[in-house]
């Protein structure tokens, strides 16, 4: 038992997929961003920029530990990379991610043009194609590095 981690850049469709999959499988679904936002008393999705990623990762680890007490297995959607100011990809610490009880990793991908449309529709924000392409590349690279380092299967 453990966490089935579904990764991918912003707007790729992680939450949309997992809402449906959770309903079908009866396996609960949580969003890393939502767990952090609830703890920080922020409105989820309001701000994509992270000021203190190390603190947020510590919060996420704590929230995951709490969830595992009630749910021995669940889906978690999240990221290996986030944007910092200026829409520059920022890699999350792999040592923190290694503490999150992942049993499997699924990396979702979509065409950058589709991701741009999804983000415009969902968040009302315009990102440059170059920034989304850079985020996708960083996310994919980190997913593979993490999987190799931890021997957690990546699909």
What positions do the PLM features span?
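Walker A (P-loop) ATP-phosphate-binding motif of ABC ATPase nucleotide-binding domains
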Residues: 3
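Hydrophobic anchor at the beta1->P-loop junction of P-loop NTPases
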Residues: 6
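Walker A (P-loop) phosphate-binding loop of P-loop NTPases
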Residues: 11
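Conserved lysine of the Walker
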Residues: 14
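Conserved substrate/cofactor phosphate-moiety recognition/catalytic segment
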Residues: 19-60
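Conserved nucleotide-sensing/catalytic segment adjacent to the nucleotide-binding pocket
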Residues: 44-84
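ATP-dependent NMP and nucleoside kinases share a basic, alpha-helical "lid"
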Residues: 79-122
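Small-molecule kinase domains that catalyze NTP-dependent phosphoryl transfer to phosphate-bearing small molecules
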Residues: 121, 125-155
